[in-house]
Amino acid sequence: MIADGMRAVLALGLFIGCSRPPNNNARADSSFAALQQRGETAMGVDQYTSQHIFEPLADGGRVVLQRKETDPAGEATIRAHMRTIAAAFSRGDFALPGFVHATSEVPGTETMKRLRSEITYSPRDLPGGGEVVIYSKNPEAVTAIHEFLAFQRMDHRAGMH
């Protein structure tokens, strides 16, 4: 009886150990592919051939978007997008991240809206694209900015630098 139980456990372990690994291909992940498509619609550039960075800083953070390949038209599109979101975020308008992430509540944005007069958004051109540097002296705003960046980083499967 115990031997039969051990055989069953071993068989199950062998089955689990030999099963196929999870598919880590981002294009095959339908929810991520949908996010990427919405991102391309919102930002105007192919998300698979662009790099996102969402970096927290002691006094805020930065959002970076750059082309992975030389693409002057794409770089100009990114720079225009960065200016657009900096202006929108300054007004407390976070509709674009809501659209891209298919949610009405992007973490951190309610506080960022409420404290918008204490947060600055500075778009800057970078080689291959651009960035928005987000700055505040208000600790509550900085915490919200970090929540916003952490969510973005996770959902976009992006890095910090």
Briefly describe each language-model feature range.
Residues 3-11:
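Sec-dependent signal peptide recognition
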Residues 18-161:
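Intrinsically disordered, low-complexity terminal tails/loops enriched in metal-binding residues
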